[in-house]
Structures are given as C-alpha cells and as structure tokens.
C-alpha cells in the first residue's frame, strides 16, 4: 500500500541481498489501467470506505512510481472528498488517504495542501480512536517533520512536546525518548546557539541499561554534527562506542552524514535538514525561472559494510536529469552506520518548488526556492547482485 511507503518514521527491514538482475519498477500502461479499473469497480458497487481507500492507494502508488503525480494526487483527493466524513468509523483508512495526499502534495510543490493534510493524518485518528496509541504517535512524529520542513520550528516543537507528554502517560518511554531526540535535533538546526548540543552530550554519557536508546540516539546525532564540522575522528569515536550490536545483516542503516549540495544558488534562509534519520532535503534559490514538471529520478546504490556508498546509478528517470548532478555527488559522499553485510537502497527524488501567490493576482506560480523531495522505495523491490568485496574501498 502507498501509505506504507509514506511512513517516514518506520524502520524498514532489509532483505538479505540475492543474486537478481537490477530492479525494475516500470509500471506498464496496462497495469495502471488495471488499478484504475479496480477502483472503478469498487465505486460502481458502492464499496465501503476502507475498500475505497485501499483501491485508491494502490492506484496512487502505481501512478507515483510511474511519475504520474498529478493523477495520483487527484485520485487521492477524490477519495478524501468521498470519505473524509467517515473518519469516526474508518479512522485508519481516512488517515492513510491524508498521508498519501501529504506526500504527493509535497512532491508537486503544493505545500499549503500538504500541511493541511499532515494535520488530517492525526485528526482522522483522533476522531475514530480517542485513546492515543502507536498510530497517533507516528502521526505526531510525521506532523512535526512536515512542520519543520516548512520552517515552523515552534509548531514542530509544540507537537513533539505534546507527544512526549502523551507517550509518557501511556507508558511509552521509548516514544518519548525518540521525540526528545528529534526535538533536540530540530533545536540544533533552528537555534545553533542553544544548549541542544550540550544536552545531547550529557545523554551520550548515560550508562544505565534503561537509557541505552537515549544514549545511542544522542551519539548518532552528535556524530552527524561532528562530521558536518569536519570532526571525522570525533564522529568515528562515537560510532565505535555504539559498536556493531545493532548492525546485523538487514538492520536499518542510519544516515550519519552527507555532504551539502547546491543545485543553483543556496537559499540561506531555508532549513535544509529534517529529523536526523531520513535524507536531508536541500532548498535552493534559483535566480531564473525553472520548469519543475515531471522531473524525478530513481537512484539505486549499495551501502558497504563500513557505511560508504558504492555502485550508485540512476535506475530510472523522467525526461531530464541534469538538475541532479550535485545531488548524486552528495549521495556518493554519504556515510551510514556500519553493518555486517552490504545493503541496497532504492530512492525516489523529485525536483520541485512550492507554489506562491504574487501580489496583485490570485494566480499561484512556482517559487524560485527549488528543492528536492525524497521517498524511500527500497522495500518495494528486490536488490540486485551485491558489489564485489573490492567495491568497499572504491566509491563510484
């Protein structure tokens, strides 16, 4: 389902590499039509909201993979019009529709709609499931991320504070810890002069078994900060403390650092990082108008056991990928957490820009603040053959 792809807070299990061909994610016209027909049959028999949502999300996922963002977003929006009033009886299907609409809107530069739908993810759950649980916690984490991506640090902090309070009341100290770490990461981005780094440093020194998650998370975040500052030795020392206990084959590979990149002219007012776990989004200020329609690439690469990127290639793209050269160079320079085996990643990147209204007219136009939107596609496809052992030291 499309909503599984959109769950940025989830840790996705990697399958062991198997000797297969390069992944193929082309969605044929006939297959797309099959999804359209399935939704049409569902609506013709007046299917219940949960079946409507399932058929819609399956179509939207296929359309997204094929680069048909507008049709996918329109399909989800139509399902929301049919079902948004059914959240009390069908909270999860309606919430999933809002989640898909949020992601598609972000990739199309429809940031105002994306923000509204991000709130809808949580509100639909609250309407049908008053007692908050893991579903609400995930929605609150997502909402905080979208608020931060939009530069609304105070809103993101407010949502995370609410999550900490609610999670602790529910006995979920692990969720509260995750929210605390994310808030410190946001604080370090928005207010570098704050004591966020000092708090992270104190967390790294906690040795009680019950505080292992807090200590490990703080070390990972500090390692990212140190690498950004050119303190590679300090970052490596922190990672060595963590050890390889959680780096078994198939474990989630955490991004430790990535070189900054600029597509044209960097906008110094934009925040170009999010929650410390997903891939940074670079915002740029274009001095010339640009065409942001149908510009996306699917990038495949291996992460070697020592955490470096190998055998990177563009697996598929739309009609032009010249904009992506700085992005690809940044991906090649990434450092991930270590693991016992190489792991494969497949990622979608979309070149887009938000719409804005110009003084004196109600006609929205593209902003000159371009950006790249990201979505992990790894769980959808089997990996190709892993690189030879020599590739660990040779970065493509």
Q: Where are the regions a protein language model picked out?
A:
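Charge-biased low-complexity segments
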Residues: 15-396
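Gram-negative bacterial Sec-dependent N-terminal signal peptides
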Residues: 1-19
């Amino acid at each position: 389902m499309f909503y599984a792809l959109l769950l940025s807070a989830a840790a996705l299990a990697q399958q062991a590499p198997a000797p297969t061909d390069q992944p193929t994610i082309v969605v044929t016209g006939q297959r797309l039509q099959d999804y359209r027909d399935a939704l049409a049959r569902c609506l013709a028999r007046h299917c219940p909201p949960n079946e409507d949502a399932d058929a819609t999300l399956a179509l939207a996922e296929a359309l997204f993979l094929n680069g048909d963002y507008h049709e996918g977003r329109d399909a989800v929006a139509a399902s929301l019009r049919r079902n948004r009033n059914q959240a009390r009886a069908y909270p999860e299907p309606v919430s999933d529709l809002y989640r898909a609409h949020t992601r598609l809107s972000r990739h199309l530069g429809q940031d105002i709609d994306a923000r509204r739908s991000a709130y809808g993810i949580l509100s639909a759950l609250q309407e049908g499931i008053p007692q908050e649980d893991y579903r609400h916690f995930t929605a609150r984490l997502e909402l905080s991320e979208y608020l931060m991506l939009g530069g609304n640090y105070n809103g993101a902090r407010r949502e995370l504070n609410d999550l900490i309070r609610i999670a602790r009341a529910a006995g979920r100290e692990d969720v509260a810890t995750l929210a605390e770490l994310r808030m410190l990461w946001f604080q370090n981005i928005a207010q570098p002069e704050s004591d966020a780094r000092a708090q992270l440093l104190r967390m790294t020194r906690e040795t009680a078994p019950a505080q292992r998650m807090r200590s490990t998370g703080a070390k990972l975040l500090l390692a990212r900060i140190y690498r950004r500052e050119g303190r590679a030795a300090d970052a490596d020392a922190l990672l060595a403390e963590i050890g390889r206990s959680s780096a078994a084959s198939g474990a989630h590979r955490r991004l430790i650092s990535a070189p900054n990149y600029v597509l044209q002219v960097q906008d110094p007012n934009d925040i170009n990082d999010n929650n410390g776990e997903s891939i940074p989004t670079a915002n740029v200020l274009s001095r010339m108008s640009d065409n942001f329609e149908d510009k996306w690439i699917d990038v495949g690469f291996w992460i070697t056991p020592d955490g470096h990127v190998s055998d990177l290639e563009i697996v598929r793209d739309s009609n032009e990928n010249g904009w992506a050269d700085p992005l690809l160079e940044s991906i090649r320079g990434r450092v991930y957490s270590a693991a016992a085996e190489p792991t494969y990643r497949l990622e979608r990147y979309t070149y887009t820009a938000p719409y804005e209204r110009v003084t004196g007219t109600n006609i929205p136009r593209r902003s000159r603040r371009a950006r790249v939107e990201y979505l992990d596609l790894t769980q959808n496809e089997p990996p190709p053959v892993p690189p030879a052992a020599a590739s660990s030291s040779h970065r493509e």
